[in-house]
Amino acid sequence: MEARPLATPEEAWRIASSLRYRHIEGTVVAVVQDVETKEVLMVGHMDPIAVVLTLTTGLAHYYSTTRKRIWLKGETSGHYQIVKEFRSDCDGDAVVIKVVQIGAACHTGSRSCFESKYSLIKALKLSLRHG
């Protein structure tokens, strides 16, 4: 599957400029969802440049708050995210990106960063144990 731009550079900058970068290090929160299954794959951060690169290349880019730089998802692993849809919330401080995930989305090698189930019962048992 081939990535295609979702916007021209001018449109991408207009979209990026309309967002409110009020989270960690001047970013918006990016919730990434599988376009077919609707499964939440991961949550990342995007600064204006990551938004523009994502929209103009059709490949998901994020701002790494630990490495302090833009990164292309899959640049080292080959597990790219081909962007099919990009939406912002009503406040403009979060986006949902619907993607075709190539390989694993999580750095642990799992398809999703949300594969571990933590139930209320487990939480209660832990609470009772540690009292």
From Swiss-Prot:
Per UniProt, Mg(2+) binds at D89, D91, D93
Q: Where in the cell is it found?
A: Cytoplasm
Q: Which GO terms describe its molecular function?
A: magnesium ion binding; phosphoribosyl-AMP cyclohydrolase activity; zinc ion binding
Question: Record keywords: Disulfide bond included?
Answer: no
Say which domain of life the source belongs to: Archaea
Cysteine pairs bridged by disulfides in the record = none
UniProt-listed GO biological process terms: L-histidine biosynthetic process
Q: Which residues bind Zn(2+)?
A: C90, C106, C113
Among the Pfam families in the record, one is PRA-CH
Please share the entry's free-text remark on the cofactor: Binds 1 Mg(2+) ion per subunit. Binds 1 zinc ion per subunit.
Swiss-Prot/TrEMBL cofactor(s): Mg(2+); Zn(2+)
Q: Which UniProt keywords apply?
A: Amino-acid biosynthesis, Cytoplasm, Histidine biosynthesis, Hydrolase, Magnesium, Metal-binding, Zinc
Q: Which InterPro entries match?
A: PRA-CH (IPR026660), PRib_AMP_CycHydrolase_dom (IPR002496), PRib_AMP_CycHydrolase_sf (IPR038019)
**Record-listed E.C. numbers:** 3.5.4.19
Pathway(s) it belongs to? Amino-acid biosynthesis; L-histidine biosynthesis; L-histidine from 5-phospho-alpha-D-ribose 1-diphosphate: step 3/9
Q: Is Metal-binding there in the keyword field?
A: yes
Catalytic activity annotated for this protein?
A: 1-(5-phospho-beta-D-ribosyl)-5'-AMP + H2O = 1-(5-phospho-beta-D-ribosyl)-5-[(5-phospho-beta-D-ribosylamino)methylideneamino]imidazole-4-carboxamide
Q: Which GO terms describe its cellular component?
A: cytoplasm
This protein's assembly is summarised as: Homodimer.
Identify its protein family.
Belongs to the PRA-CH family.
Please name the PANTHER family in this protein's record. HISTIDINE BIOSYNTHESIS BIFUNCTIONAL PROTEIN, HISTIDINE BIOSYNTHESIS BIFUNCTIONAL PROTEIN HIS7
Q: What does this protein do?
A: Catalyzes the hydrolysis of the adenine ring of phosphoribosyl-AMP.
Its protein name is: Phosphoribosyl-AMP cyclohydrolase
Q: Which organism is it from?
A: Pyrobaculum aerophilum (strain ATCC 51768 / DSM 7523 / JCM 9630 / CIP 104966 / NBRC 100827 / IM2)
